[in-house]
Amino acid sequence: MAKRGHTQRPAGDVDDARMLAASNEPENWLLNGGTFGGERYSLLDQINTVNVGRLQPAWYFEYDTTRGQEAEPIVVDGVMYVSTSWSKVYALDAATGRQLWFYDPEVAGTDGAKACCDVVNRGVAVYEGKVFVGALDGRLIALDARTGKVVWSTMTIDPDSMQTITGAPRVVRGKVIIGNAGADFGVRGHVSAYDAATGKLAWRFYLVPGDPEKGPDGAASDEIMEKLVRPTWAGDYASYGGGGTAWQTIMYDPDFNRIYIGTGNGSPWNPKYRTAGKGDNLFLCSVVALDADTGKYIWHYQENPQEAWDYNSTQPMILAELDIEGRRRKVLMHAPKNGFFYVIDRQTGRLISAAPTVPTTWASRIDIATGRPVEPANARYTEGPFLAKPGTAGSHNWHAMAFSPKTGLAYLPVAENQSLLQTNPDFRPVPMGPFNHGVISRHGAGASYLLAWDPVKQREAWRVPYRGGGVLATAGGLLFQGRGTVIGEFVALRADDGRQLWSWPTPNGIQAAAVTYMVGGVQYVAISTGAGAGAMTGGAEARMRQPGRMVAFRIGGKATLPREPDPAPPANPAPGPFAQEVVDRGAAVYRNYCYRCHGPDAISSNVIPDLRRSAYLPDKEAWRAVVWDGALESSGMIGWSRYLESEQIEELRAYVSWEATRLKNGQAPGARQTGSRRSSQAVVQEQ
């Protein structure tokens, strides 16, 4: 069906009424998720199952950063607003890709070391002439939508903590709502609302209890914190931070004037340390409903009581109406990391149904009467190792899922994996170092696929095997999804049966979700490309680093994309030899401090440098200048003199050189082990 083009309006002219009626103007993409329902479904059908084979690039735009790209752009009246890694923001002409303005918040490179999983950003919000972005360093920034100039900026976290921001803000009735990340590093999660016009704090809601000796927080959460939350914790939880960060999903429900928050994992993971093995630990791994105006608690549903597997519940939600057992129900659909697909009553917070989308060992089922999982003995590895399925990487992570009212199906990228977990008896929190997990872990990956799921029948409709990113559904009967960890492919499939109809190679891997919009009567499909997210790409083929790109497609497009990047340089080991005990000590240093960015066993796709190929590796003094002195701090590689001993720098070089020699000789990688344990090498790329 033909859709009208955009009318001439002031830049960023989006108000509450327009957001509420976003589905009535599919030529725009006004909100993260498309509408307040987050369906990521567009009524545009100019591109459809008949003509999608003629889809070609219309334009592309190169960012100034080579790190991971996870943002979903916002398109308002022919202007695209998109954030990139390092929290930078571009305004582009949505028809041509021409840059209108650019904003760099100048996040310090040292803040990159606080991020668990790359310096990514998942998007902006546009409201009343402003563009809002959460910066990695914790600032919430309002920009003039016409010029990109700063209107106001406020710090939302303790800048001395390990908290960061990677999620997109949500604007609701004149307030900008933002969460934060950092649960793997011992922080206390909270969500804050700020006046969109002034940046003044309106309310704050803490998601786990703080130090009881310090008294109330003076926050919207105070009453429910003492009445309901704190009694579910035990032991010295306050000294560990607790976790529960809301690093991604914040939804608004106009039917009830509520926001829904997806909360994160515990800090540390192991409840033996976090809470003396007692209590449910509210509000970890929960969906929490709050009054949008005041931040007051309304209800919660906890998907993982006494969380122990990094099964956070921050993943995307979809708000919809479904016909269930003869009744029209207002529901919230959620597929968190724990492997189950939940359908929850939005009004009451009660569970309607839940079923596993992948093999699960941590729970056999979810009891509908109580809403609680039915767990086996030793699920929390209290009596020895436990093989958790899915593993700590989760079955469905931050990647967007979509819902088509046309097919009645939800579409989500899913992965089967497993983790062997056991208590680490030597655990102690270490600042800026390893994840504060309290576990020893091994990990294995299995099948990955795009899953079409019937939320009413709670069963699979179909699957297509491959590892992919976020999903977009359209009225043209199509699904769009990106693939690839270093170089990529953008594909279109039939929404009814998953049959692939079209694909286009991209020089960058793709993680983000696409959006679609119309300018001048022409429908476009656009996606931000560029893989990253730390060690998640550790097993991928290493290539030369390249900038991320926004790529827009249209029927009969004429643009030519750049060619794929060349292979990365060869292994570059130091002359050596190094004593084996020195290599072993260096392996321990690497596992504790380096792998979360540079990959397990020193294997990296080179989005973040593959150290085995580093030009600094053969030169002892050059290596020391970078790793000890911080010569590359502006790029995010801090100097580790505050956390390591001087001799450990050379031990680290010995280990990386050992791995480089194995690569050069065609041998399989394998981190040296010291004793009977290895530190956690969890691939938990999410925040």
Regions found by a protein language model. Name each.
Residues 4-57, 214-224, 372-376, 439-440, ...:
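Blade/loop signatures of beta-propeller domains
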Residues 29-33, 68-88, 113-139, 164-185, ...:
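Repeat-blade elements of multi-bladed beta-propeller folds
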Residues 93-96, 144-147, 196-198, 292-294, ...:
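Short loop/turn segments that connect beta-strands within beta-propeller blades
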Residues 565-593, 635-687:
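Flexible coil segments in periplasmic/lumen-exposed cytochrome c-class electron-transfer proteins
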Residues 587, 599-629, 636-640:
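Gly/Gly-Pro-rich "capping" loops immediately C-terminal to redox-active cysteine motifs
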Residues 515-567:
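Blade-level signature of beta-propeller repeat domains, shared across WD40, Kelch, NHL, RCC1
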Residues 560-582, 595-614:
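His/Cys-centered metal/cofactor-coordination and adjacent catalytic loops
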Residues 61-72, 102-125, 153-168, 206-249, ...:
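Extracytoplasmic beta-rich repeat domains
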